[in-house]
Swiss-Prot record:
PANTHER family: PYRIMIDINE/PURINE NUCLEOSIDE PHOSPHORYLASE (PTHR36540), PYRIMIDINE_PURINE NUCLEOSIDE PHOSPHORYLASE (PTHR36540:SF1). It is an enzyme of class 2 (transferase). The lineage of its organism: Bacteria, Pseudomonadati, Thermodesulfobacteriota, Desulfuromonadia, Geobacterales. Disulfide bonds: none annotated. Belongs to the nucleoside phosphorylase PpnP family. This is Pyrimidine/purine nucleoside phosphorylase. One of its GO terms (cellular component) is cytosol. The keyword Glycosyltransferase applies. The keyword Glycosyltransferase applies. Keywords: Glycosyltransferase, Transferase. It comes from Geobacter sulfurreducens (strain ATCC 51573 / DSM 12127 / PCA).
Length: 104
């Protein structure tokens, strides 16, 4: 889906890691939420409450998911699932555009 209709956009930005990651929250009529954001090159560790699906729209990063010691390359057009109540680390290699869907 490249376009969202009939949604509410939260005006205030979500700013993490001194501006290295910035997103906006999109709220759908059924109450579900997504964030649309940009990540600058760098290393970032996030924690989750609800399970998430991260879609990488463009850019490239190396990803370490919970319970794994391996780094996996993820690029534009790919996605990955993050379990609830966990943390994951990304080494962002180039400017990365993403969409994060919150499932819980």
């Amino acid at each position: 889906m490249s376009e969202f209709t009939n949604v509410t956009i939260i005006r205030e930005a979500n700013v993490y890691f001194d501006g290295g990651v910035v997103s906006r929250t999109v709220v759908f009529p059924d109450g579900t939420k997504k964030t649309l954001g940009i990540m600058q090159p760098g290393e970032y560790t996030f924690t989750t409450g609800a399970p998430e699906i991260m879609e990488i729209l463009s850019g490239e990063l190396d990803l370490k998911l919970p319970g794994s010691d391996a780094w996996n390359r993820v690029g534009g057009g790919e996605s990955f699932d993050v379990p609830a109540n966990s943390s994951f680390t990304m080494k962002v290699l180039s400017l990365t555009d993403y969409c994060c869907s919150f499932l819980g």
